[in-house]
Amino acid sequence: MPRKTVFEMSFADVYPALIRKAERKGRSRAEVYEVTSWLTGYTAEQIDAALASDISYGAFLSESPAYNPRSDLITGKVCGIQVETIEDPLMKRLRQLDKLVDELAKGKAMVTVLR
């Protein structure tokens, strides 16, 4: 059986891992929702609806209602890769969200994380 890419995986399988990453470091689910909303334009209710649906992680990111134009200010490394140098737009979105959650988990202030 071929392996699924992260884009093909269910949003409901991937997103809770981001929440757990933040919660392990003393941050809240609400803060993960806040950075997700800032980046994608989804409301908390829309995120909850996506979690209850069978939408893929790739579709969740590519169908963002209002992707933040300030997302280009997200820089740094995620998994050893410079976020700002990623050429594939969908992979860049995935890594940008991961970077924001990483910054939360590292204890950065929300005002800093949201640029």
Describe the predicted segments one by one.
Residues 1-115:
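A charge-rich, low-complexity, intrinsically flexible signal that marks solvent-exposed coils, linkers
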